[in-house]
Amino acid sequence: MKLLVLCIFAMMATLAMSRRWHYVPPKFLNKAFEVALKVQIIAGFDRTLVKWLRTHGGTLSHVQKKALYFVNRRYMQTHWANYMLWINKKTDALGRTPVVGDYTRLGAEIGRRIDMDYFYNFLKGRNMIPKYLPYMEEINRMRSADIPVKYMGK
């Protein structure tokens, strides 16, 4: 029982520190900046997926490959707020007002640096590629720029 309480307190402390000690109001992005980020992040993830499919995707069905493209988009949506924390640090360090090219460069860096190969191998190796459902088709059909994210631009 004591161990359970200790684990719960440790988890609460971890969550509190991951959210910072004080409230950090979100910075809203200009729509052009948001689009530049999304397009470059998805392009990087998709480029990685194409390379991975060329070497490891021979045994996957067409539907499973489409599900992996959905995984790319959902991964970006899930981690968008964390990307924004990193991007805010990088743009603040510029010492000037950021432009679309800065956000394009940062989005490309995120798309290139995140090791999605490991994630694809994990999903394939454990037979955990999600079943392809209609809502996945909707998101896959969207342009990269139109994929909804929680940290919305104006």
UniProtKB/Swiss-Prot annotation:
GO annotation terms (biological process): single fertilization
UniProt signal peptide: 1-18
Cellular component aspect of the GO annotation: acrosomal lumen
Organism domain of life: Eukaryota
Pfam family, one: Egg_lysin
SUPFAM superfamilies linked to this entry: Fertilization protein
Tissue distribution of the protein: Sperm.
Keyword terms, alphabetized: Fertilization, Signal
Gene3D superfamilies linked to this entry: Fertilization protein
Functional note: Dissolves the egg vitelline layer nonenzymatically during fertilization. It creates a hole of about 3 mu-m in diameter through which the sperm pass.
Complex and partners: Homodimer.
Protein name according to UniProt: Egg-lysin
Record organism: Haliotis sorenseni (White abalone)
Upper classification of the organism: Eukaryota, Metazoa, Spiralia, Lophotrochozoa, Mollusca
